[in-house]
């Protein structure tokens, strides 16, 4: 499976998370996953909450439209973004490569 997949208007992201980073950003590819750096530590679900907030802001959707499908407790996650309003250029480039 690729890092980014468009499925019935939703975006499926296979992510590798780097917690406790200096800033929030989509870094690029990490193997077959998209690497995302976030500032939150991986303690008591703070990283997941922060990741959901960051992705919601990035894709201009409510936090309730960000779903962690797999990897709740690990660095490797599969995320579903319901009907994203904006898709960042780094992700559209990856989608173009996999088409």
Curated annotation (Swiss-Prot):
Transmembrane segments: none annotated. This is UPF0235 protein Sbal_3028. NCBIfam families: DUF167 family protein (TIGR00251), PRK05090.1 (NF003466). HAMAP family: UPF0235. GO terms for cellular component: cytoplasm. Pfam families: DUF167. Belongs to the UPF0235 family. SUPFAM superfamilies: YggU-like (SSF69786). It comes from Shewanella baltica (strain OS155 / ATCC BAA-1091). PANTHER family: UPF0235 PROTEIN C15ORF40 (PTHR13420:SF7).
């Amino acid at each position: 499976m690729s890092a980014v997949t468009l499925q019935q208007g939703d975006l499926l992201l296979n992510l590798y998370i780097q917690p406790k980073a200096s800033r929030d950003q989509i870094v690029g590819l990490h193997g077959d996953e998209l690497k995302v750096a976030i500032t939150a530590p991986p303690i008591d679900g703070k990283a997941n909450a922060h990741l959901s907030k960051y992705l919601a802001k990035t894709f201009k959707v409510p936090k309730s439209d960000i779903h962690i499908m797999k990897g709740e407790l690990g660095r490797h996650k599969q995320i579903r973004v319901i009907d994203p309003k904006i898709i960042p250029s780094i992700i559209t480039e990856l989608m173009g490569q996999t088409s």
